[in-house]
Amino acid sequence: VKPGALLGDIGYVIQQHAEGNYYSVVRDYCGHGIGRIFHEDPQVLHYGTPGTGMELVEGMTFTIEPMINAGKSGTKLKSDGWTVETRDGRLSAQWEHTLAVTATGVEVLTARYEERF
């Protein structure tokens, strides 16, 4: 992540890493921009085609929050209107970080001390 990179490149890397380890990427949910409104554009997909999507510029802030499934990528929303499950009943994991694009790369704003690099 750095100025000039494209959002499709981020999604592609996440997808390749997940699928390369025999997992799938949920396509029903995505990351998002952070600004004056909490969930705003751009949508940040966790799958994609390299060389596509919005160009990153210094000062952009957005989340990456992939949901990675042990089975297939399909999900279903439970009747409570909030809880999401995998369609095939397999395990899933989700995590989120907020990133800021800097002149020299990226700052992970939500990284715990032990995660900083």
Residue ranges, per PLM feature:
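Active-site neighborhoods and metal-handling regions in enzymes and metal-associated proteins
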Residues: 1-117
